[in-house]
Swiss-Prot record:
Catalyzes the transfer of the enolpyruvyl moiety of phosphoenolpyruvate (PEP) to the 5-hydroxyl of shikimate-3-phosphate (S3P) to produce enolpyruvyl shikimate-3-phosphate and inorganic phosphate. Gene3D superfamilies: Enolpyruvate transferase domain. The lineage of its organism: Bacteria, Pseudomonadati, Pseudomonadota, Gammaproteobacteria, Alteromonadales. It is found in: Cytoplasm. Belongs to the EPSP synthase family. 3-phosphoshikimate binds at K22, S23, R27, S170, S171, Q172, S198, D314, N337, K341. Its EC number is 2.5.1.19. Its main location: cytoplasm. GO terms for cellular component: cytoplasm. Keywords: Amino-acid biosynthesis, Aromatic amino acid biosynthesis, Cytoplasm, Transferase. Pathway: Metabolic intermediate biosynthesis; chorismate biosynthesis; chorismate from D-erythrose 4-phosphate and phosphoenolpyruvate: step 6/7. Pfam families: EPSP_synthase (PF00275). This is 3-phosphoshikimate 1-carboxyvinyltransferase. It comes from Shewanella sp. (strain MR-7).
């Protein structure tokens, strides 16, 4: 197994241009596919999740051209649903942002489609989405365990009508349903059951749908109306914002050991909720400066916070490791959906934080972290989870440094993360 040793860093300073957002990249690729016209996507993320989506689209007959560095994609839309004359099997790795939307999109046309992935994907639930699609007439069959991939879709199109979908596990289910609803045979009325988690991710979806010419009537996130007869039309160009979750590590670095760190590609005008991570750092005592398309974090003594972070679940992980450098006990609440991500992130985070000496209380949907007087070095297991590897890079700011096991798992969203991180040393 590959290991990466991070030696202690005294101070950080610098500027990082954040690679494209995973959430926006895969949503935009799918909408461009369903749209009429050719779309040029710039600052597309070049990572495993996006490669799985692109490979699947190519297999389904979608035409596109990629630039040499894979960050510009010119894609010719189908002007409607995806159909196939022969049965197709698509391998989607551990890419939830490809599995969920494609599962929904492939019900719209005609054909037989089987969706598979890595072993971890077979543990990531999809039942809430499938149940909703079945209410609109979809024919979907599980191949192993009820409620989980792999699955086979026999597509004949989606009916309109009323549909209920659970909102309390993952916003990706609602996102997938919203994106396909305009191409159903009639108007669709979506009722959200339970508390909707990660609302800002729904805002990303609605903003992109509007960019492609489709309007959704949002009744305070409890009900969504999508009128029949709408069509996605390419806006011509789509600029993919920098990934706000990826920005969180560099902003935390600036807060803990700045100096001053500036991230570009996200800012005040961002459509991603995870930029609110900077507000949490500010509450902890960091000096934060906002621009339209940049955020600057400067170092200051940090103090613990006790916050509901349901709205920023991915970036909240960075707070868990930043808490090691804050005075007092930090509590991160309402984050049950950490448990159904690339790994059970609540259990994984608690285990690894204890290795470096933290006192940790792990609850059903919260984590409480009290830093030790002196942090210990350790070998951090990353659970094939890109965010675990990036979060624990913060331990480079302890006097003992840290060893990261399987550092290349960052390829899911940020292949050159550790090279960029190293560039910040003052």
């Amino acid at each position: 197994m590959k290991q990466l040793r991070l030696e202690p860093v005294v101070q950080v300073r610098g500027e990082i241009n954040i690679p494209g957002s995973k959430s926006i990249s895969n949503r935009a690729l799918l909408l461009a596919t369903l749209a009429k016209g050719t779309t040029t996507l710039t600052n597309l993320l070049d990572s495993d999740d996006i490669r799985h989506m692109l490979a699947s689209l190519k297999q389904l007959g979608v035409g596109y051209r990629l630039s040499q560095n894979n960050t510009v994609c010119e894609l010719t839309g189908l002007g409607g649903a995806i159909s196939a004359d022969t049965a197709q099997t698509l391998f989607l790795g551990n890419a939830g942002t490809a599995m969920r939307p494609l599962c929904a999109a492939l019900t719209l046309g005609r054909g037989e489609f089987t969706l598979t992935g890595e072993p971890r994907m077979e543990e990531r639930p999809i039942g809430d989405l499938v149940d909703a699609l079945k209410q609109l007439g979809a024919n979907i069959m599980y191949l192993k365990n009820e409620g989980f991939p792999p699955l086979t879709i026999n597509a004949t199109g989606l009916n309109g009508g009323d549909v209920e979908i659970a909102g309390d596990l993952s916003s990706q289910f609602l996102t997938a349903l919203l994106m396909v609803a305009p191409l159903a045979k009639g108007s669709v009325n979506i009722h959200v059951k339970g508390e909707l988690v990660s609302k800002p991710y729904i805002d990303i979806t609605l903003a992109l749908m509007a960019q492609f010419g489709v309007q959704v009537i949002n009744h305070d996130y409890a009900r969504f109306e999508i009128l029949a007869g709408q069509q996605y039309v390419s806006p011509g160009k789509v600029l993919v914002e920098g990934d706000a979750s990826s920005a969180s590590y560099f902003l935390a670095a600036g807060a803990i050991k700045g100096g001053e760190v500036k991230v570009t590609g996200v800012g005040r005008l961002s459509i991603q909720g995870d930029v609110k991570f900077a507000d949490v750092l500010e509450k902890m005592g960091a000096d934060i400066e906002w621009g339209d398309d940049y955020i600057i974090a400067r170092g200051a003594p940090l103090t613990a916070v006790d916050l509901d972070m349901n709205h920023i679940p991915d970036a909240a992980m960075t707070i868990a490791t930043a808490a090691l450098f804050a005075k007092g006990t930090t509590t991160i609440r309402n984050i049950y959906n950490w448990r159904i991500k690339e790994t059970d992130r609540l259990a994984a985070m608690a285990t690894e934080l204890r290795k470096v000496g933290a006192l940790v209380e792990e609850g059903h949907d919260y984590i409480q972290i009290t830093p030790p007087a002196v942090l210990n070095t350790a070998e951090i297991d990353t659970y094939n989870d890109h965010r675990m590897a990036m979060c624990f890079s913060m331990m480079a700011f302890a006097d003992c440094g840290i060893t990261i096991n399987d550092p290349d798992c960052t390829s899911k969203t940020f292949p050159d993360y550790f090279a960029q991180f190293a560039s910040l040393k003052a």
